[in-house]
Amino acid sequence: ATVMYMQDDAWSGVDTDHVKLWNVAIDWDTPNDSEVSAAVELTTTPFVSVFDGGSFSNLPQPDGGIAIDALQATIMNQAQFRKFSNYNSALFNFVVDVDGSSTKQAGIRWYELRQTADGEPWEIFQEGTYTAPDNRHAWNASLIMDVRGNIGMGYSGMSSDNSSDSQVRVGSYYTGRFAQDPINVMTLEEGIIVEGDANIPGTRYGDYSKIDLDPDNDKKFWFINEVMSGGRKNIAGVFQIASNFNNDLAIISIDTPFSGVLSTNQSVTVTIQNLGEADVSGFDVSYQIGNNVEVIETYSETITSGSIAQYTFTTTADLSTEGETYTITSSSLLNGDEDPTND
């Protein structure tokens, strides 16, 4: 088993921000023969994890409410392990101060470590710092990976001094990312599980939250967290990232053109994501400039389940009129697509 801890260079005796790992081999028959390896340090992108010198009173609540615990210097519940066919993955997070000044704003530093096989060294595959919309506090997080490699993350959110809306009380929220998204970023928009309706009455808050997967489909994320909602309660919410459909394609971005000097033969490139369970190939995609004739072409290669691919249309667009603002729309035209709302 692997034991991990985060260490901040603001702490005495710590020179650089890092994650420290120990391998523990327990001999259940002869406990005295158990072994703990020397520590392995993985240097991280610098972070600030100290709030108020390490005290338990950190994040002021709206309307002069008591400042509650940011749960600093702790890897939050829990580091999650998952085996895939060609690598192992571990996810974890802890709170950081993303403001960089005397004004505090809690954010979530999260990591995915990978090893190529059991017993091989762990390496940082991706690390990101999540900040909530409107510069709200985000902390007390828990994250896990579903059967498709998508990440779901639940967390606590509340107004900070940097927020335009100062009245958001402690609530429970979620975000996430698809497995094929650009690394280091939680790409999904924030979702609301429950908004708080009152301040937490003391400094102690949460201790930890907990996310887990529904064993029924290995896709639904269940997240439980502490909020004030008609009293102090632990409330569970459920959300899902992976599709339940066999056939489901989506155009997730129009990559070019974007802006600048455009030409009479402008290339149009889009990114397609296969959200379904089945691999797909030989489907049509289209683009349209304003109300002009729709361009339809065939994507002949295969996009495996959960993967993304770029396609550049062979038919170019005339976008050369100076001062003109062009509107470009694009769609996937898969026969039998079971969710046409995201095409």
What are these regions (language model features)?
Residues 1-244:
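C-terminal PAP-associated
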Residues 244-343:
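Extracellular/luminal regions of secreted and cell-surface proteins that mediate adhesion/ECM remodeling
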